């Protein structure tokens, strides 16, 4: 993996996670850029949620579920839990409302669906799936997406359902600091973009605000047939302008899957968009002949400029990989040959 903008050796158990017999593999993330002072209890809560979602995906894969069904299933679970910044628990706009976005992509035929500006849809990732399966389009946003949701009969709730007391407090702090909380995390005025910097003077409940700092979620899967899929969901930036769209719903930027691999990204959205980060992993595999972990390391090092981000990926041969150039990334991964890892730091 990569860290702090430089390439460091990958641990052997993770650098080449290829199942020689093929088979399924899965990775889940809950965001890159973690406060090094994150209290142990918050770390454990995140690991428990990631483990639960990973096991949910593993169970489905063992039951021969398809990759596209598994990524939707896992991300729905992440959206339902308020710990991370997607679905319930999403970051708030400058108006104090929630505008969510998500995307999903099925690798074998490169079908995709994406949504933005959702305010009432309980599970944005499932609406993105319906855009892919039930509409002639790839991307619907704001009132058009909401209308489509009602036509399809998906579960909708009041906007207040998504708002948590922690996020109300964070929005207040962001407004007082006259800034946004970059990727639902740390005021850019007092912290660098991935959690490493001087101690923030802003606190909530006596703790640095970055302890309330999970962000974008995603899942990538290759099933036993070698089919790859990817899904990503987020509430975006705290105190963002209404109408802002990040990388998560943009196919090729925050999410991508093809016959070669599946990728989900997290971090500084504008940098991920400029680097078309998710597609770049597939491109260097296809055109430079790199393996999955090599491709991940390459794009994190060479395609982010000064941006901070991370990503998870799987290949059609059963490899699973991840990389990030900041302090940490909430992640969990497993493969059919018995490998499993749940972690935050390097």
For each of these PLM feature ranges, what is it?
Residues 2-3, 7-346:
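Alpha/propeptide regions of enzymes that mature by internal proteolysis
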